[in-house]
Amino acid sequence: MRKTMLPLAAALLACAALATPGLAQPTVTVVDYGGTWQAAESKALFQPIAKKLGVTLREDSLQTIADIRLQVQSGKPTWDVVALGIGECLAAAKEGLFEPVDYSVVTNAADFPPELRGPNYVPGTVWASFVLTWSKEKFKNGGPQSWADYFDTKKFPGARAAYNAPRFMLEAALLADGVAKDKVYPIDIDRAFAKIRAFRKDVAVWYTSFGQAVDLINAGEVDVVPVLDGRIIDAIAKGAKWDFTFNQGIINAACSAIVKGAPNKATAMKFLNEMLDPELQANLTNYFVYGPMSPKVYATGLIKPEVAVKLNSYPANFKMQVVLDPHWWADNRVPVQSRWDAMMKE
């Protein structure tokens, strides 16, 4: 009996050893804003990273940082990596919702300007630009090319839509009022509000989401509207007879972080590093039209030239724009939003 049991025990141990790697395969849960954007990001970035690292990928979506707060407050978060706008990152980091970044692991972050990374967050994957767009049917000889043109309804008559939020709109108002790009911050709040208050009578629709802005474009309800570049590029690709300019665009960074108490922190840290890899970020342009954030992405040679020139982070386009200052907004968002809401009720 003893002689029979020993070989059997050895066989069981061997099977267990073979099974262990599969059972122990690391898992990482990555969270973004969902929709078509996250679907594209998953194919271009998340899935290739998971394959490269040999980890099991899970995904979820969020709406606001309140969702992250609930994860942390539960005491047993299920999320690991979250991707956000940089303003949301600053707010969440201030609340202590993120793990400290181990920069000895996230070495790709060194490629980015220091103002885009912090102790608890790193740069994200893409930039998004708030740009001026117009109907080519209304303006057959070229539409408004600056925020001054947007606010000038005599020079460029036509139905205007405007974003019902202070972020982006205050910057646009100051640029329209003659403030130089490098002097936009700190925002002269009184001056910006005065410009917008005088403009209110000329606005046909105050939209509340960028999806609504695209609906207005497709329905032909307006002739001039500021919107995110990815939205208008997609609308044009689907047949909208519109055009846009990156001139004086307001370009906003994204960021990524690890949720406080993340169940797979070590794996998440490696995943975070790969998200900043320029070659992997270049792959995003095969699926979506927002410009990758890595400063080295265009040097990879992996982005088709005809695609590169249409992206907001392409050097010639980037230098035409104003980089939104998330630190100013983190310090001023609440009082400015209150003032905006009061103005819209006047």
Predicted regions mapped to residue ranges:
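Mature extracytoplasmic/periplasmic domains
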Residues: V259-M320
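A bilobed periplasmic-binding-protein/Venus flytrap-type ligand-binding module shared by bacterial periplasmic
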Residues: V131-K138, L174-V179, A253-T267, L272, ...
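A ligand-binding cleft/hinge motif common to bilobed small-molecule-binding domains
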Residues: C89-A91, N218, D223-K241
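Paired acidic/hydrophobic, glycine-rich loop segments that form the ligand-binding mouth/hinge
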Residues: D80-A83, V205-W206, D223-L228, D243
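Periplasmic-binding protein-like
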Residues: A128-F130, D190-F199, I236-A262, Y298
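Extracytoplasmic ligand-binding site segments that recognize negatively charged/polar headgroups
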Residues: Y33-S42, P77-W79, A83-L216
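Early extracytoplasmic/lumenal segment of secretory-pathway proteins
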Residues: Q25-A91
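Conserved C-terminal helix/tail region of periplasmic/extracytoplasmic solute-binding proteins
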Residues: A316-E346
